[in-house]
Amino acid sequence: MKPSIYSLTRDELIAWALENGQKKFRATQIWDWLYKKRVQSFEEMTNISKDFIALLNEHFCVNPLKQRIVQESADGTVKYLFELPDGMLIETVLMRQHYGHSVCVTTQVGCNIGCTFCASGLIKKQRDLNNGEITAQIMLVQKYFDERGQDERVSHVVVMGIGEPFDNYDNVMKFLRTINDDNGLAIGARHITVSTSGLAHKIREFANEGVQVNLAVSLHAPNNELRSSIMRINRSFPLEKLFAAIEYYIETTNRRVTFEYIMLNEVNDGVEQAQELADLTKKIRKLSYVNLIPYNPVSEHDQYSRSPKERVAAFYDVLKKNGVNCVVRQEHGTDIDAACGQLRSNTMKKDRQKVVAAVAD
């Protein structure tokens, strides 16, 4: 199975070209074909020699993903189900915003974090995606625009799809540098957000990277007892350890942290929990932000339901009265398989049913 050429950073592509007897400018030309002209095959690179194209084909493919399903929402949201070369399935989402087009990418096949409300964790982690497989998601969404003759581009990226990005740290960092490269897609670092469930040691490492990429933390509860009951990760990285890492990140980067807080009816959405959350974030209030997220119900997690608007409003009011910067997140794609991991899970369920039916016949 040949790797995708997207898995190489620009420096790695230059090094590979030099090792294979080519000039540096040839690597620059290839990079330009990939990320500016966005070709889907090496044969389309008209200023590259046939011998070098043959060498490229021998060692690499271009895009390793196959499109299985596309769901388009009435609000313009597009959800993709992609198949990897080994047959594994991943999701990617395009969200149309007033400020541009944002793409949510997946970083792992399955997830081992074990959040009890999340569709992503219904399938345990099978493997990490490599840098090329993550980058390919962006390239196929951009291809969606290009094929429609739309003068539009992917302007924002959120690393919030299936999997824990910091559990696949090295590949995610290579991906971030690839899409941020000024000679390629040139997606601004401040238009990119990476979300973690709270791997404290990786937050510290991320703080030392010197990148301007935004950090979001999936918090979802304001105390250890509740957070440990709905997010297994809290048993390894309790709030004291997590917030020490967050404070280090803020001190090191002087950048704001966003806290994601999914609203679960009568679980974590009471006014007393809102006050706890306000107290928890008080020390870092000037450089923190709370994103209240309406819950997309998952049939396998029927113990949870969406918080009524009245409870969300009351929670929000407590935060605002305490001076917390917060917002209720705008929903996207509510008329399709909206929850992260839901399209993949539902498709795999249907595939299994087909196999069972075929065996029964």
UniProtKB/Swiss-Prot annotation:
Cofactor: [4Fe-4S] cluster
List of residues binding [4Fe-4S] cluster: C111, C115, C118
InterPro entries hit by this protein: Aldolase_TIM, Methyltransferase_A, RlmN_N, RNA_MTrfase_RlmN, rRNA_lsu_MTrfase_RlmN/Cfr, rSAM
Signal sequence bounds: none
E.C. numbers: 2.1.1.192
Keywords attached to this entry: 4Fe-4S, Cytoplasm, Disulfide bond, Iron, Iron-sulfur, Metal-binding, Methyltransferase, rRNA processing, S-adenosyl-L-methionine, Transferase, tRNA processing
Classification via CDD domains: Radical_SAM
Main location: cytoplasm
Residue positions binding S-adenosyl-L-methionine: G163, E164, S195, S218, L219, H220, N296
Cellular compartment(s): Cytoplasm
Reaction it catalyzes: adenosine(2503) in 23S rRNA + 2 reduced [2Fe-2S]-[ferredoxin] + 2 S-adenosyl-L-methionine = 2-methyladenosine(2503) in 23S rRNA + 5'-deoxyadenosine + L-methionine + 2 oxidized [2Fe-2S]-[ferredoxin] + S-adenosyl-L-homocysteine; adenosine(37) in tRNA + 2 reduced [2Fe-2S]-[ferredoxin] + 2 S-adenosyl-L-methionine = 2-methyladenosine(37) in tRNA + 5'-deoxyadenosine + L-methionine + 2 oxidized [2Fe-2S]-[ferredoxin] + S-adenosyl-L-homocysteine
Gene Ontology, cellular component aspect: cytoplasm
Active site, UniProt feature: E91 (proton acceptor), C340 (s-methylcysteine intermediate)
Cofactor annotation remark: Binds 1 [4Fe-4S] cluster. The cluster is coordinated with 3 cysteines and an exchangeable S-adenosyl-L-methionine.
Pfam family, any one: Radical_SAM
GO biological process, one term: rRNA base methylation
Domain called Radical SAM core: residue spans: 97-335
Organism superkingdom: Bacteria
One annotated GO molecular function: 4 iron, 4 sulfur cluster binding
EC class name: transferase
UniProt miscellaneous comment: Reaction proceeds by a ping-pong mechanism involving intermediate methylation of a conserved cysteine residue.
Family: Belongs to the radical SAM superfamily. RlmN family.
NCBIfam families recorded: rRNA_mod_RlmN
Protein name (database record): Probable dual-specificity RNA methyltransferase RlmN
Species of the source: Streptococcus uberis (strain ATCC BAA-854 / 0140J)
Biological classification of the source: Bacteria, Bacillati, Bacillota, Bacilli, Lactobacillales
